[in-house]
Amino acid sequence: MDPNMQNMMSSYLKIKKLVGDEGSDFEEEEEGEDEEEEEQERVVKVNFAESQLKKKKLNLGEGSGGKSGEKHTASGGGVVAQPCCLVENCGADLRNCKKYYQRHRVCEVHAKAPVVSVEGLMQRFCQQCSRFHDLSEFDQTKRSCRRRLAGHNERRRKSSLESHKEGRSPR
C-alpha cells in the first residue's frame, strides 16, 4: 500500500476511534458539565482531524471526479489521477518529472514545443500563463502570449521611466 494512503487510513481510523460507536445515542447521554465538556472537546478533535484528512486527500490529488485514466484508491473513497501530458497521443508519465510539469500536466518536450495538438486544436504552451493557447495568441516563435508579454514590457518601461526621473541611468 502507498505510504501516503497508509497514513490517511491510520488518520481515518483515529477519527473513527475518537467518534466511537456513539452515532445516534447523543440524546441518551447523562447531562453534566464534565461530560458536555468532554463531548465538546471530542467534537473539536474530530472536526480538526477531518479537516486535516481532507487537506491530505487534496494534496494527494484525490477529490471529486472520476475520469478515465485515474485509479481508485484501496479504500474506495477517492480517486488519484495519474499525472500524464495533456497533448494528444502523448500520454507521457509525469510521475518522475519535476513538480512544475506535473502541476501543469505537460511533459518537458511539449512545454517547449512550438506547436502541439490539444483537444483537436493547434496550440502552444505559454510559459507565463502555464496554459495552452491558440497559436494566434503568440508572436512568431515566442513562448509567452502577447497579453503577458505586453504586461511584462509595460512593467519594464515603467521601471525604466522611474529610474530616469530619479537621475539614474537605465538598466
Curated annotation (Swiss-Prot):
Residues 22-40 have a biased composition (Acidic residues). A motif (Bipartite nuclear localization signal) lies at residues 142-158. Zn(2+) 1 binds at residues 85, 90, 107, 110. Zn(2+) 2 binds at residues 126, 129, 133, 145. The keyword Ion transport does not apply. Residues 20-46, 57-76, 149-171 are annotated as: Disordered. One of its GO terms (molecular function) is zinc ion binding. The SBP-type zinc finger is required for the binding to DNA. This is Squamosa promoter-binding protein 2.
